[in-house]
């Protein structure tokens, strides 16, 4: 028998990352311990905010980051990557 890939969906609200960054994501899909998609993500940094989603495409599992309205002085992709690491550590 071949193992079955199990997907689980999590909800995170007001997760505090480094430097006071807060992230909420209402549909975080995890498969085999790895974040594969995030829908309805929101980040608040110093009273500024932006939204994001993540999709996992292709055989190589490459992640596509969709960031919306990121302020010019904020590295949105690094914040989202930090959130992914947080989630994968949290569920391990």
What name fits each language-model region?
Residues 1-37:
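Negatively charged, low-complexity tracts enriched in Asp/Glu with abundant Ser/Thr
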Residues 53-92:
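Mixed-charge, Lys/Arg-enriched low-complexity segments
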């Amino acid at each position: 028998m071949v193992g079955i890939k199990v997907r689980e969906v999590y909800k995170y609200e007001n997760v505090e990352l480094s430097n006071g960054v807060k992230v909420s994501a209402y549909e975080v899909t995890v498969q085999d311990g790895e974040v594969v998609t995030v829908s309805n993500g929101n980040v608040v940094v110093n009273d500024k905010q932006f939204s994001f989603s993540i999709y996992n495409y292709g055989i190589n599992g490459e992640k596509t980051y969709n960031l919306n309205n990121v302020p010019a002085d904020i590295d949105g992709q690094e914040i989202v990557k930090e959130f992914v690491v947080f989630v994968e550590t949290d569920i391990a």
